[in-house]
């Protein structure tokens, strides 16, 4: 019953339903994670079931209070030295500034995620450029100016958190040759709300990823490409709560040739940054590893 998953049932009711179903999840990582958390943080060896759910609820609640088990407590006692969030270039990183001042045991950085500037066919592309312009405190009237704004924000991210990693999500990617003039024309067309052909989208994204990689390289960033993201799978929920709120999932696309051409072209000019590539589809790991 969805009521006990994302519905309006209380957290206690959802917990009891979770305990009821957990014994049937043997072989699923959730079963292992639950057992690990009970042992690691509460020293409880018993498997969680409907029969002992109330007892475990009471014991863990008491321990949480006695040990002041906050999220930070859990990270420190798990010896978590580094946590990386991921933020859009327009983010002001206010909470990262607060964390820096508090000198936590766990270091918290962010990964630079410029996806929205890559998705030129999105209806909100022009609106996003206006926000990026405000964040970078400069006009953006061309593809070149957008790249300058993104580099300024990347350097700001590095200054605030010390990060040296990007987070580029690629749903699918075909390399398409382009000229600077063609890309500027596509940028202008997208910014004005014009309908782009698939070839134009491929050209723009090729130019975007190529130029961002060069920016990463000269700023000593690691380029992280996670590939095969199926974005906004639940459109009704995306409309109600926004993008990047839990409604993306794994696709089975494997744009090996496109990414290969991108990396080859960067290698040819000697500007390939350190790179991490991983597919969201676990069955494609061997494809990308080799």
What is the predicted function of each stretch?
Residues 1, 222-231:
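Histidine-centered catalytic micro-motifs
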Residues 1-219, 271-290:
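Metal-cofactor-binding active-site regions of metalloenzymes
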Residues 65-69, 232, 259-263:
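Short hydrophobic/aromatic-rich motifs at helix boundaries and adjacent loops
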Residues 178-187, 227-231, 235-253, 265-270:
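Non-catalytic scaffold segments within catalytic domains of secreted glycoside hydrolases
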Residues 240, 246-261, 265-268, 274-290:
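H/E-rich (His + Asp/Glu) clusters that bind or coordinate divalent metals
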